[in-house]
């Protein structure tokens, strides 16, 4: 590790200014080395702070080097609130070589890490004594040093001891060398006490949504080992041990904690959350475990019933297939006397163009649709159609269908259109000629012709000949 000479005070000043700017950026503090500074000799308005540190020395005569962990550093501090300025005087006491006859005092060399730690401790004292700030339990930062130093302190060659300020006196707990960490071999002989915590059973008799906090329960003064049949969950952990000296490793005892919890049973489904009850801790047990740290966990599955939720799919009944029936009335009125004779209709099924383009259209099986039983003959009193009735102008009827509406699947549409209605007695002749006759006269009324043909066969023959002549001429 790189070491700095105390004679080069720029390193000390640089670190000190950085620390002060972090806590008091608007105040000005100055660090002044003073070789004539004496401990416990203070001027009015000044306070003192002293600390021991580790340093290395080099003899200027024989070039011999040595290290010491009893190097005394003294600080005198003063703060002027009116001027917003502060001053710190510092002195590091030196040592001399014990091999030379009349050696001079050598300047100590302090490592960079220890310089930072010493000035941090000084900053705490400034906040506490000058600004009346800080915490009551604010401790000093321990310093780093070589723990392999052996032998007593050479007080005959120590500057502080020669002046009467012996550095061997305890100046604070932070100046003691830090203890080395525990080695694996030295921790085997340490025995740890065992602490057992037992929790009682917790049961639930009815559903509830309450949350219960831990309750205190009594524990026997001497806890015995739990039986194997009892369900339990035991956890044993070993916290890290604090640094100890090699001489005190044998007597070190580490605590050991064992937590035992019983089952949580429920007779009915419940949303109640219960926590194990707290219990008193027994510092002594009958059977301690092994010396090595361990973590053991033993658990038994809980008997709490589980609720299974199965999501059922929604079954929707199939929609009935709608039937669209459009029946156009005859443009000519029908007398009441002829209503009984109208039993059969020679229909001509013509499907609207909009329905033909639909993929759900089912064509009718026959163009002829016989009259159903739901036919109601008109009464004797004829009621003419109202003004709201609009007769169709074309033989093809187009049913307006909204673009946003589509027929559901399996939809059957049937369109009926009645042609000219003829009496039942005229069915023999109309079946042969009426359809062609209507096409020639562009669906004009052929009632007179049908009446004539119904009177005599000769009249029918005459009309047939006339029809052929007209067909030939046209």
UniProtKB/Swiss-Prot annotation:
Subunit composition and interactions: Interacts with TAS2R16.
Biased composition (Polar residues): 197-228, 259-304
Tissues where the protein occurs: Expressed predominantly in the liver. Not detected in the olfactory epithelium.
Record-stated family: Belongs to the TMEM7 family.
Annotated zinc fingers (3CxxC-type), start-end: 53-164
Gene: Rtp3
Cellular location(s): Membrane
Chain spans, region Disordered: 175-304
Record-level Gene Ontology MF annotations: zinc ion binding
Stated name of the protein: Receptor-transporting protein 3
Spans within the Cytoplasmic topological domain: 1-453
């Amino acid at each position: 590790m790189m070491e700095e000479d105390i004679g080069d005070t720029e390193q000390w000043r640089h670190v000190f200014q950085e620390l002060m700017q972090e806590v008091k950026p608007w105040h000005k503090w100055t660090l002044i080395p003073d070789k004539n500074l004496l401990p416990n000799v203070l001027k009015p308005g000044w306070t003192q702070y002293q600390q021991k540190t580790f340093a290395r020395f080099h003899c200027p005569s024989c070039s011999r080097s040595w290290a010491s962990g009893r190097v005394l550093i003294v600080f005198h501090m003063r703060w002027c609130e009116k001027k917003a300025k502060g001053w710190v005087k510092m002195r590091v006491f030196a040592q001399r070589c014990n091999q030379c006859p009349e050696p001079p005092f050598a300047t100590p060399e302090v490592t960079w890490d220890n310089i930072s730690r010493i000035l941090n401790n000084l900053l705490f004292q400034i906040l506490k004594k000058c600004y009346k700030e800080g915490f009551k339990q604010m401790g000093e930062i321990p310093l780093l040093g070589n723990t392999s130093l052996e032998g007593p302190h050479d007080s005959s060659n120590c500057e502080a001891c020669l002046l009467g300020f012996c550095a061997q006196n305890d100046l604070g707990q932070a100046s003691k060398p830090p203890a080395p960490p525990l080695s694996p071999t030295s921790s085997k002989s340490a025995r740890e006490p065992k602490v057992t915590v037992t929790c009682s059973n917790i049961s639930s008799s009815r559903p509830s949504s309450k949350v219960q906090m831990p309750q205190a329960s009594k524990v026997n003064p001497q806890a015995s080992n739990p039986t194997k049949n009892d369900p339990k969950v035991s956890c044993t952990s070993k916290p890290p041990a604090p640094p100890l000296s090699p001489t005190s490793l044998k007597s070190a005892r580490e605590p050991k904690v064992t937590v035992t919890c019983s089952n949580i049973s429920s007779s009915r489904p419940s949303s109640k959350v219960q926590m194990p009850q707290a219990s008193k801790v027994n510092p002594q047990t009958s059977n301690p475990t092994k010396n090595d740290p361990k973590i053991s966990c033993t658990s038994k599955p809980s008997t709490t019933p589980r609720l299974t939720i199965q999501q059922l799919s929604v079954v929707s009944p199939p929609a009935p297939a709608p039937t669209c029936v459009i029946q156009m009335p005859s443009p000519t009125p029908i007398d009441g006397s002829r209503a009984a004779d109208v039993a059969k209709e020679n229909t001509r099924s013509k499907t609207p163009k909009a329905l033909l383009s639909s993929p759900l259209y089912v064509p009718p099986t026959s163009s002829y649709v016989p009259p159903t039983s739901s036919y109601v003959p008109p009464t004797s009193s004829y009621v003419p159609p109202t003004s709201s009735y609009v007769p169709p102008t074309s033989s093809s009827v187009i049913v307006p269908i909204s673009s946003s509406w589509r027929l559901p699947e399996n939809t059957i549409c049937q369109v009926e259109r009645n042609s000219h209605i003829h009496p039942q007695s005229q069915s023999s002749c109309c079946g042969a000629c009426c359809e062609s006759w209507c096409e020639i006269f562009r669906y004009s009324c052929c009632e007179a012709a049908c009446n004539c043909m119904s009177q005599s066969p000769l009249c029918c023959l005459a009309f047939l000949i006339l029809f052929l002549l007209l067909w030939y001429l046209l």
